[in-house]
Amino acid sequence: MGLYHSIYGTEKFQGFTLSVERRAEIRTLIGERAERLSYLNCAVLRASIERNLDSDKGPFAIDDRICGEVVELSREDFDDLLRVHLCDWLEQVPRSQEWTYRRDAYRRMAEWLGGVALESFEQVYAGH
């Protein structure tokens, strides 16, 4: 996924973006699964992630801000979306200095994923 995680723009980032009409081109470049996760990261209404964190049994679903629909996800896709979304934010927050922006939600995502995700959250937010 790498550089493509926000290729279509996100709820918060609307800088350089490609139109979703070019999804097929992106799929050809990075593969179907990576493109789907990139799209989901771009399309998700961030608040819709949190309602899934109350039960690890599912079903898992997010609100798609681009098409206006609810998208159901497998546990694997939900976890991978969380990884991408959390890593993206943890990379941005030191530059943006938005330490309070959805902090509790990002902590819950890190706790859900555990391991390196939680360690990274704690390291990035240490002292803030």
Model-derived regions: residue spans:
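Divalent metal-dependent catalytic cores for phosphoryl transfer on phosphate-bearing substrates
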Residues: 1-109
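Charged phosphate-binding loop/patch that engages nucleotide di/tri-phosphates or the phosphate backbone
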Residues: 109-128
